[in-house]
Amino acid sequence: MFPWNGSRLGVALLALGLELSVIPATVLAVDLDAGTQRDIRAATFEVVQLKPPDGAVTYERPLPLDLIPYQQRVDLYRSIGTAFAIGPNKYVTAAHVLAAGAASQYGPPALRDAAGNVYPIYQVLQYSQHEDFAVLSLQNPPHHVQVLKAGPKPALNDVVFAVGNALGEGVVIRDGVFTSESPEEFEGKWNFLRFTAAASPGNSGGPLVNRRGQLLGVVLRKSPSENLNYALAIDQVMTARPGEGRISARASVRLPIMDIAETREYDEHFALPLELSEFYKTWLAVIEKENERDYTELLAHNESHVFPHGAGAEKLLHTIESSPLPQRMHEAQNHIWVVDGAKSQNVQLEHNGFVDFTSDMVRLHAPDDVDLATLYGDSKLQMDLFLKAYTLRRMVGTDSVRVTSLGKAKTEETFTDVYGRNWQIKAWAIPNDDAMLIVLSLPTPEGYCGSYFRIPTGFSHMATQQQKRLLDFVFVTMQGSLGRWQSYLTLKGIQPKIFDALSIDVEGHQQVNFRSARFDVSVTPNLLKLSDGSIMRLNFAFLHGADTVVWDVAGIWVAEGPHSQNSVVVWREAEPTSDLPDGFQDRWRKMRNRDFPFNATVASENSETRIATTTLPPGGPSGVKVVYGLRVVAEGTQPQDAMKQKLDLLQRSVKQLEH
């Protein structure tokens, strides 16, 4: 559910997957004598991780664990791959198998022999991400371990054997033939071995051997388009530079908000050996550094049309709309920036609460019995409410069980975006899936809104950094009941920086006073019947400031209640640039000249009556760049005189401070 194209992160995430798929096959090994099979099995180990406890996770019903195969159910470890011995305390596996342990919620990878003995990994001696191999040593290696010796390069159609663990059920040997070689993807610097011997999940990192039990390669992955598997020739391991770690990749770097891409390459080297924990720190640091550099450069290379720069931004800089559910801004055709909110799902909660959400955006309207201070400070409560709407399930055999709670967040931080909006970033652990569910939320007077995503644990930090970058491209307005607004305004440190320049006085059923550097407005009972349940929305928008674009209040809407049509609205209209569509030009001319519907004449539609005007007299003074629209809406069909009186009162209550 990462709401962006994979690019560099996608390349990194590949390292977390066991790349082999199941190929139905019979376990044959018919050409291997018993002694050779015994030696191969003695030299081959499972790569395992200790399973984590569920911790604070709760479910809607007991887990049907009996649906899990017995061996997997009772095993304290999960099998993630295979390794084999090539020398005294020297073991080889696939690089992507080792990478699965990076920042994992499972225990660090270890090797397990056929007797069930588990040997912690001590050091990483060699590592190559592109060639996909790693050489390891163990803390307390087994005595007199069997070692596989390299054999000659196989001839076409030679019988070969793929060796690997069967997901905790022991080492399995499958036969096939060597079919061909395939050049590596970048420059064709070496050839992978391709073979037909079937391989299953868990075989990654295992040995490919000939009928004499001699080592030919490291089993890596299945061909995406045919029933063939790939292995790295063992010569690539044996001739690799000792004491070196190498992370190299070629990938397309993209942003989900723009139709831009660059092909990036990197080739980073670091010294080995390193103890396993230090290796992971170094490995993640290299990948995160490259990721940060690539996206920084991608934005810099396209700065001329990245919002808010360029003519394509003007449409959005003249857009004011209600958006309590956040919308991601994105660049459409011809570099025009727009907000196109995806269709959302709405789930009702108890006590008038609800959750509105898309695949990556969320709006929580807190239940009446949940006060805002508690919501912002209690991460368990925040996620529990979200999980009443967002379906998170745990697969158990052929069944799946819904998660009802993830407990408290494992990490919490705050982040202020370029527009001064203070986001709360919280990450909840999903131990069984080795994943994190991360919410970047902006506290609002009704609860919170923001974005969310789910990511493998090892890449949660890097993914969060990317999501922070995208917060600058979130379009959102803020609304809530007057009672909630009173609570929200007392909670310091959570409000966006722009609130320092605003004066908002909410006096329950008495009046609402709003003042900014741009306009003032007062709403009193003579204009609108007010109560603690009345709704006020501040329509924030991106506006041209003195020397930069700012996020500021561009309008205010107040309604008698959440389901009432009786309301007043004041909004800002800036003179459009000449290249904006005719609709912008036409609305500006009508507002400047007070043409219909801004001529203080009633119009009825959809069971309501509207009347509107502007803060300027007809024609207005020359050189005016900003005008404010004023509208009164009433339920049913209302007479002109009564509506005009309300509009006059609103006009006297509004003062435009900018021109």
Regions found by a protein language model. Name each.
Residues 331-395, 515-579:
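Secretory pathway targeting signatures of secreted, lumenal, and periplasmic proteins
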Residues 74-141, 155-156, 361-374:
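Catalytic-histidine neighborhood of serine endopeptidases
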Residues 31-37, 123-124, 144-145, 166, ...:
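C-terminal cap/linker of serine protease catalytic domains
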Residues 149-171:
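Short glycine/Trp-rich loop-beta-loop segment that forms part of the substrate-binding cleft
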Residues 27-84, 91-94, 254-322:
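N-terminal activation segment of mature serine protease catalytic domains
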Residues 248, 342-347, 445-506, 525-527, ...:
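Surface-exposed amphipathic alpha-helical segments
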